[in-house]
């Protein structure tokens, strides 16, 4: 479970409450914006808690340049993030400029590695905006660029993760890339559906609600 706190209205108090939830429940990471990253790192130092921290870059539309995304990623890693969730350049993807998309991901990957070799890169492709052919090409491009994860959605567009898209990516992955389902996942049943379809991680801001549902409805703790 990747727990997200990405709203532009999130105050420091809200971010710290989300950090507390993430550390108390052992989530895979907390995903925040670079602007709130200092609050997260301060909280973790102050409480002596540990958590993986992911910064969302080029968020939410992916429309900044490759160089800006690379700088954002490098700066976030310097500030303490050990994971990056970057938004693919959807304009370029829709224009079939897949070389640009691949090179952008590679540039971000290199910028991250210069700061910390162990950082994970997740690429958000915003599946609701892509055709089936574009989804396939996006997955192939993420694999070619050596991303660690392909991620379905930002949660800020017109649609979110679907079981069909997770199955599509799982069929293409062949152990070369992992899959993160994100966007619109609110219930225990949705969470289980995504995992069963092939996702290794699920991104949501409804993490505690899902955990409670897993225990109440399925006896999973």
Task: Label each PLM-derived region with a short phrase.
Residues 3-25, 35-179, 187-213, 220-221:
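Alpha/beta enzyme core
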Residues 32:
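N-terminal beta-strand-loop-alpha-helix module at the start
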Residues 182:
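Short hydrophobic "strand-cap" motifs at the C-terminus of beta-strands
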Residues 28:
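Metallocofactor- and cofactor-centric catalytic cores in central/energy metabolism, strongly enriched
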């Amino acid at each position: 479970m990747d727990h997200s706190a990405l709203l532009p209205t999130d105050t420091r108090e809200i971010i710290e409450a989300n950090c507390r939830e993430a550390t108390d429940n052992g989530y895979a990471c907390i995903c925040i914006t670079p602007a709130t990253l200092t609050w997260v790192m301060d909280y973790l130092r102050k409480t002596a808690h540990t958590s993986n921290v992911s910064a969302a870059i080029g968020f939410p539309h992916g429309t900044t340049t490759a160089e800006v995304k690379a700088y954002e990623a490098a700066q976030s890693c310097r500030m303490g993030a050990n994971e990056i969730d970057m938004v693919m350049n959807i304009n370029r993807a829709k224009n079939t400029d897949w070389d640009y998309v691949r090179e952008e991901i590679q540039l971000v990957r290199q910028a991250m590695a210069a700061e910390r070799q162990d950082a994970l890169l997740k690429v958000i492709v915003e599946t609701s905006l892509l055709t089936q052919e574009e989804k396939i090409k996006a997955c192939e491009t993420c694999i070619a660029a050596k991303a660690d994860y392909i991620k379905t959605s930002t949660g800020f567009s017109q649609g979110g993760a679907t079981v069909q898209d997770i199955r599509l990516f799982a069929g293409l992955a062949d152990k070369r890339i992992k899959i993160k389902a994100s966007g619109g996942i609110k219930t225990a049943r949705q969470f289980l559906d995504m995992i069963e379809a092939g996702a290794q991680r699920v991104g949501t801001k409804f993490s505690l609600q899902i955990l409670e549902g897993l225990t109440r409805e399925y006896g999973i703790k």
